[in-house]
């Protein structure tokens, strides 16, 4: 596995949630799609967000593997929330565009997307997300790479 994907993937063993985690989680829980798919917020740090998506019939495609749309949505969310960690509480982000490269398909286990901020400007924020597959034994395998551009927008709730 490349060093890009060999970086730390959280195993859900973290201390009490921070104020930053709680702020991001409040927005994440409003995401109907993420709730429908069964995704969960795993880790939030300044400039970083990790989201998990367990395998289920809600996220598979006709051949039984994870659907590319589910992978893309997971990467979009991880990158978007990584960007949001760089903003004031009254702001959120909206995706302007993203490009994703699918590296391999997987069945079972769970996907983890780790979004990272590359540049946080006043008008645009550029992020990346690495998507990896975790099998039942905890082995990670590269799944997808995403690059994204986002725009800060006022929070509307």
Region locations from a protein language model:
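Feature marks short, surface-exposed loop/turn motifs that line or immediately flank catalytic pockets
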Residues: 59, 81, 152-154
